[in-house]
Amino acid sequence: MTSEQMAGNRFLDLSIEELMKIEVTSASRYSQKLSEVPSAIFVISQDDIRRSGATSIPEALRMAPGVEVARLGTDKWAISIRGFNGRFADKLQVMMDGRSVYNPLFAGVQWEQQDTLMEDIERIEVIRGPNAAVWGANAVNGVINIITKKAADTQGTLLSAGGGSFEQGFVGARYGGKINEETPFRVYAKGFTRDHMGTISRGN
């Protein structure tokens, strides 16, 4: 583990033995201990997201070193690793639970469509550097894997609300239940009121 990987992260509170046991999946498609991963990987935990007050995935990604986050409008973002930033960056593999959300029609990721409830994200794994051998041609500059909680871990009802500088107000609702003992599910909805803005704000 490098200091950069751990900086600003809740894992600083863990012992060396506990750090060695943390598992990630984005580096090689299967679960590995963080100490065994050869790539430069940074993990954003649910605790990190909650403490930061991030209301969207792009805002949460500002915590990852080496990730450039630019806000292009009310709900449009440009996100890249190792430069080459633009509205649709085609050299970055972005996944939700291991499945690519890359849109070949636009040759990039529509971040405004990745609007899952922040409370339902377990962690975000960010890998800097080429990983095309594992994740394909888009993974030239890096990989972002957004891993959500299992449906079995999000049972019951959740209501959330808040606001900010550009997002005047938002509300989210989620319900988790079971069809049977082996088939849990969850459904959610979000609504928001946003200011129109055209300036660019940049992250790391």
Predicted segments, located by residue:
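Residues embedded in well-ordered beta-strands within globular domains across many folds
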Residues: 20-23, 68, 122-125, 145, ...
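N-terminal periplasmic accessory domains that precede
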Residues: 57-60, 77-82, 92-96, 111-116, ...
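Short sequence motifs at beta-strands and strand-loop junctions characteristic
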Residues: 73, 136, 164-167
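Short acidic/polar hinge/loop motifs at secondary-structure boundaries
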Residues: 100-128
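Short, acidic, small-residue-rich periplasmic hinge/interaction motif at the N-terminus
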Residues: 1-50
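Non-catalytic regulatory/gating segments with a bias toward low-complexity or hydrophobic composition
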Residues: 19, 41, 49, 60-61, ...
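Periplasmic-side early beta-strands and strand-to-turn transitions of outer-membrane beta-barrels
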Residues: 133, 153-154, 160-162, 174-204
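Extracytoplasmic beta-strand/coil segments of soluble accessory domains associated
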Residues: 26, 30-34, 38-42, 58-103, ...
